């Protein structure tokens, strides 16, 4: 297992993206894919090329803003793009993605009906995308370091982080929070008893106030470095996505470091996230795109993706093929108790996006 990634909800404001136009690839038997780094099986692209003879140009994006800029510019040359479910309605409204011809996806029946039902909230009828991976956002603790400082504390509560007296005791061993307002921000709103979809100006002010009490104890706002900082014991508390917890554990094991990490989903609720393969409206290699999408719906293919990235996939038929160490981990494949704590965020209004962006700037500035 290598560097896993889900940096998908760290940016807001589609209209702020700067234009970028990518060279077009229209050769027969070619495919242009746009995805997060290290967010697919180690040999998936190579295997697809070998099996189909289709030549793949595989581009990576490092931030939501970068992805938005390219897609909103149009004429990108991409045929398949990985899209965050929460932002999908905005992209559909802008006409970025085309409706899929389900008859060309012979492996569609492998998808989990429960995941498809949830995705209806982003895309009515699941007409524009193929669900790929999903998970939660939570807190990863170095149990030994945390228990030494806060013995007996309830780690299923965000009180561990957002009660100043607790955060002060953890400051010396390091606290990392995601630089992602729709993840940690929504978690804190839920902790405050506020439904994120109903949040207004006064609610975002309460969120800012909650962060202000602990801001001095936060080491960093980060979406990447905790994967190294946790195994190196440079931090003891990290707000992470579910799959990244598993990657940090694997990195420690590979380095021969004894590390007692555990991932907790706060009992006050957390947002679930879903990533979806989509086909841009201006895709030029649609035959190749359908071949790739159907390939990614194969249980054997997507199981290898989960084994490599550490993220649960949306393919019901693939679960039995996933490494048992992953499929049996409730942090990655949530149990019934964890599922009860999860909710699917509803798309934000433009006003809510503006308020959250402003609140997040205040929080990070301290």
Give residue ranges: language-model regions.
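Mature extracytoplasmic/periplasmic domains
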Residues: 26, 275, 280-341
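Conserved C-terminal helix/tail region of periplasmic/extracytoplasmic solute-binding proteins
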Residues: 228, 336-366
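N-terminal secretory signal peptides and thylakoid transit peptides that target proteins
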Residues: 1-16
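Short beta-strand->loop
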Residues: 98-109, 159, 255-271, 280-283
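Periplasmic-binding protein-like
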Residues: 204-213, 219, 257-278
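A ligand-binding cleft/hinge motif common to bilobed small-molecule-binding domains
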Residues: 87-92, 239-257
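Early extracytoplasmic/lumenal segment of secretory-pathway proteins
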Residues: 27-91
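Extracytoplasmic ligand-binding site segments that recognize negatively charged/polar headgroups
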Residues: 82-217, 224-231
């Amino acid at each position: 297992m290598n560097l896993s990634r889900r940096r998908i909800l760290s940016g807001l404001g589609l209209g702020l993206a700067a234009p970028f136009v990518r060279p077009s690839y229209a050769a027969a038997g070619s495919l242009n894919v746009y995805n997060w780094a290290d967010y697919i099986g180690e040999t998936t692209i190579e295997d697809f090329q070998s099996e189909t003879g289709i030549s793949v140009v595989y581009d990576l994006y490092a931030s939501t803003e970068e992805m938005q800029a390219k897609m909103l510019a149009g004429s990108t040359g991409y045929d398949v793009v990985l899209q965050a479910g929460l932002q999908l309605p905005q992209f559909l409204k802008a006409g970025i993605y085309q409706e899929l011809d389900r008859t060309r996806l012979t492996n569609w029946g492998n998808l989990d009906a429960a995941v498809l039902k949830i995705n209806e909230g982003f895309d009515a009828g699941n007409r524009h995308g193929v669900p790929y991976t999903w998970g939660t956002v939570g807190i990863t603790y170095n149990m030994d370091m945390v228990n030494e400082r806060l013995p007996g504390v309830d780690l299923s509560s965000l009180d561990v982080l957002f009660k100043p007296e607790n955060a002060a005791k953890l400051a010396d061993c390091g606290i990392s929070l995601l630089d992602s307002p729709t993840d940690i921000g929504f978690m804190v709103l839920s902790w405050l008893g506020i439904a994120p979809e109903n949040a207004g100006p006064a609610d975002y002010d309460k969120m800012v106030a909650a962060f202000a009490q602990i801001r001095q104890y936060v080491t960093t706002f980060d979406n990447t470095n905790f994967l190294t900082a946790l195994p190196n014991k440079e931090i003891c508390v990290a707000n992470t996505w579910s799959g990244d917890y598993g990657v940090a554990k694997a990195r420690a094991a590979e380095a021969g470091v004894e590390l007692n990490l555990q991932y907790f989903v706060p009992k006050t609720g957390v947002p679930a996230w879903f990533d979806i393969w989509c086909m841009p409206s201006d895709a030029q290699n649609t035959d190749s795109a359908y071949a790739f999408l159907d390939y990614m719906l194969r249980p054997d293919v997507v199981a290898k993706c989960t084994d490599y990235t550490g993220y649960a996939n949306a393919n019901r038929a693939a679960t039995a093929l996933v490494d048992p160490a992953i499929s049996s981990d409730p942090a990655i494949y949530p149990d019934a108790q964890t599922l009860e704590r999860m909710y699917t965020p509803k798309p934000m209004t433009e006003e809510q996006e503006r308020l959250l962006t402003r609140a997040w700037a205040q929080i990070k500035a301290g």
